[in-house]
Amino acid sequence: MTLSPDVIDGLPYVEGVLNYLTPMAERPINLAYDLPPGVPRSTGVPEAHRVTIYNVRPVATRLSLDSEGLALVTHNSAVRDFYDEDELQRVYYPEAERLVAEVTGATRVLVFDHTVRRRVWGGVDRSAGTPRQPVTAVHNDYTVKSGPQRVRDLMGEEAEELLSHRFEIVNVWRAIRGPLRDAPLAVCDATTVAFTDFVPSKRSGRRSP
């Protein structure tokens, strides 16, 4: 169900500044490895825009992955320490699999990765001894090419059979503590984004020779 403008206009909101990509001729490159201090991790240049960010909690039941590309659900976890890697994989992975299956109706769910982000002022993301930092740029994680490739990377001989059916890559996010005042998560209603607005980027996981 797509939310009407009248419904959206009636929601609580805040104004915020988000970093979009400055238009550029070449494809941006993101570097996912340790770099010397001061070296940017992306060739893309951020362009700040002030936008309206709505609180969709009052209409959470009207949102869906199939329409808006997002779902807001309540979930109680048995995890006691989200900074404990073993507990995350032992307890939270099965919880997340059950949650995604319930929300999507999927017959099979595989959790293949997780990231715990915690703001450290002055910390550099992906640097030794620093937890992963909040992402400060508007972005999408997968393209029509990299999504199926992720399935091939993970599923081996099963991949082509699985790709002959419908599949989704779903991000599950939650606050470890709240309320969040520093870097709360914002997501975009997919019905408001044109496919032509997406800019594919290249991700480099190792230093070139």
Regions found by a protein language model. Give the residues of each.
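Non-heme Fe(II) oxygenase catalytic core, chiefly the N-lobe of the double-stranded beta-helix
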Residues: 3-209
